[in-house]
Amino acid sequence: MIQNQKIIDTQRVINYINSFLDNVRVEDIIQNSGADKLRVYPALFELEQSGFLEVVEREELGAPLIVMKRKNG
């Protein structure tokens, strides 16, 4: 069940990011995507590692503040 919820929340994050053409604030993803707020940062990390998105701006300690879908060259 936990694995299924992780997949569902990751898909919610993907769907939310896909609804924008440009940058997306992580705070907006947390508030509006429907994903559990505790799963958003791990999902963003996995999506960055997979090449789906890029982090445009980070906090001082490295947490993403603004992300965008990676444009395929």
What are these regions (language model features)?
Residues M1, N32-S33, F52:
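Long, compositionally biased intrinsically disordered regions
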Residues I2-T10, N23-R25, E57-G73:
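Short, cationic-aromatic polyanion-contact patches
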Residues R12-F20:
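Short amphipathic alpha-helical elements of helix-turn-helix/winged-helix folds
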Residues F20-S33:
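Short acidic, hydrophobic short linear motifs in intrinsically disordered regions
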Residues I29, P42, E59-E60:
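Proline- and acidic/polar-enriched loop/turn elements at helix boundaries
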Residues A35-E46:
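Short amphipathic alpha-helical interaction segments
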Residues E48-R58:
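A short, conserved structural fragment
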